[in-house]
């Protein structure tokens, strides 16, 4: 089964860094995406806020460069978890992160 998502956007919540009891570092933030997509011959505004989690030592170095307002592209897989309120929430598990040069 294929489960692959590539999403570009702007970090809209301060990254939260934690280390699990087993010593695995995690970084969580929310990525906001806005674009215009073509569907059935019409232009459509696309918008979402996607929770992202970066786990493991491999990508932690780049997470220290990520702040609110950073433009990034994230590649990974999506999964759901049950929130404290009992509702299912989708999250993007990042496997690759690329900072987008703002051109400044």
Swiss-Prot record:
Q: How does it assemble?
A: Homodimer. Interacts with PriA and DnaT. Component of the replication restart primosome. Primosome assembly occurs via a 'hand-off' mechanism. PriA binds to replication forks, subsequently PriB then DnaT bind; DnaT then displaces ssDNA to generate the helicase loading substrate.
**Function of the molecule:** Involved in the restart of stalled replication forks, which reloads the replicative helicase on sites other than the origin of replication; the PriA-PriB pathway is the major replication restart pathway. During primosome assembly it facilitates complex formation between PriA and DnaT on DNA; stabilizes PriA on DNA. Stimulates the DNA unwinding activity of PriA helicase.
- The answer to whether keyword Metal-binding applies is no
Q: Which GO terms describe its cellular component?
A: primosome complex
A biological process (GO) annotation for this entry?
A: DNA replication, synthesis of primer
NCBIfam families in the record = PriB_gamma
Q: Where is the SSB domain?
A: 1-101
* Gene3D superfamilies, A to Z: Nucleic acid-binding proteins
UniProt entry keywords in alphabetical sequence: DNA replication, DNA-binding, Primosome
What InterPro entries does the database record attribute to this sequence? Answer: NA-bd_OB-fold, Primosome_PriB/ssb, Prisomal_replication_PriB
Its family remark reads: Belongs to the PriB family.
Q: What is this protein called?
A: Replication restart protein PriB
A Pfam family recorded for this sequence: SSB_1
List the GO molecular function terms: single-stranded DNA binding
